[in-house]
From Swiss-Prot:
InterPro entries: Oxoglu/Fe-dep_dioxygenase_dom, PKHD_C, PKHD_hydroxylase, Pro_4_hyd_alph, Pro_4_hyd_alph_FE2OG_OXY. Coiled coil: none annotated. One of its GO terms (molecular function) is iron ion binding. Keywords: Dioxygenase, Iron, Metal-binding, Oxidoreductase, Vitamin C. It is an enzyme of class 1 (oxidoreductase). 2-oxoglutarate binds at residue 169. Fe cation binds at residues 96, 98, 159. This is PKHD-type hydroxylase BPSS1206. Its EC number is 1.14.11.-. It comes from the Bacteria. Binds 1 Fe(2+) ion per subunit. Residues 78-178 form the Fe2OG dioxygenase domain. Its cofactor is Fe(2+); L-ascorbate. It comes from Burkholderia pseudomallei (strain K96243).
Length: 227
């Protein structure tokens, strides 16, 4: 499932993150690439664990912790600390798949990459190109979202970023280990939770159908969750 999550950051929060990022030193994006990705990747990136990356990343993690749609869709168990990249002057990232396991440098913190996330930090009208293109059974899905919006998609997906030919595309990217590793199971739970929330708004939390469906949701989560 590929999902657009609007307004993860407010415009004010985006501006605060950009103040941090624009004052930072950027390095070759291949610092975090696997062997396959390094062949296709051309961009700039904030060094992993740098003060700027930590400060902006903490702001994003705080926002995610308050985002009900993110929790419903991802069912996060672990979130890899957000990283940041910048594409300009023809930079692009060819078709690749993300590594299955991400290790935080200098620690024993590991994340199985069930989901990938890209949080846009530049308005789409300020640059040309830079679309995130995610492939699945049904074709290629493109994302170029307003600043503060995020796209969430299975980390097993082939994907690429088209060349940026004007301006600069700035974004955060990171990976999530879900409590439910299977994408189809996780999608079913998200769809069920969405309908439960709709019925709750219509009928109230004491309605018998709401209570029954909530029980089914939690029993499925109990069956499928790793946690």
């Amino acid at each position: 499932m590929m999902l657009h999550i609007p307004g993860v950051l407010t415009k004010e929060q985006v501006a605060q993150c950009r103040d941090i990022l624009d004052a930072a030193d950027w390095t070759d994006g291949n610092a975090t690439s696997g062997a396959q990705s390094a062949l296709a990747k051309r961009n700039r990136q904030l060094p992993e664990g740098s003060p700027a990356a930590r400060a902006a990343g903490d702001a994003i993690q705080d926002a995610l912790a308050c985002n009900a749609l993110f929790f419903s869709a991802a069912l996060p168990l672990k979130v890899f600390p957000p990283l940041f990249n910048r594409y300009a002057g023809g930079d692009a990232f060819g078709t690749h798949v993300d590594n299955a396991i991400r290790l935080l440098r200098g620690t024993d913190f590991r994340v199985r990459s069930d989901l990938s996330a890209t949080l846009f930090l530049e308005e789409p009208e300020h640059y040309d190109g830079g679309e995130l293109c995610v492939e699945d059974t049904y074709g290629v899905h493109r994302a170029k979202l307003p600043a503060g919006d995020m796209v969430l998609y299975p980390a097993s997906s082939l994907h690429h970023v088209t060349p940026v030919t004007r301006g600069a595309r700035v974004a955060s990217f990171f990976w999530i280990q879900s409590m439910v590793r299977d994408d189809a199971d996780r999608t079913l739970l998200y769809q069920l939770d969405t309908q439960i929330q709709r019925l709750t708004a219509e009928k109230g939390g004491r309605d018998a159908s709401v209570i029954a469906l909530t029980g089914i949701y939690h029993n499925l989560l109990r069956r499928w969750a790793d946690a």
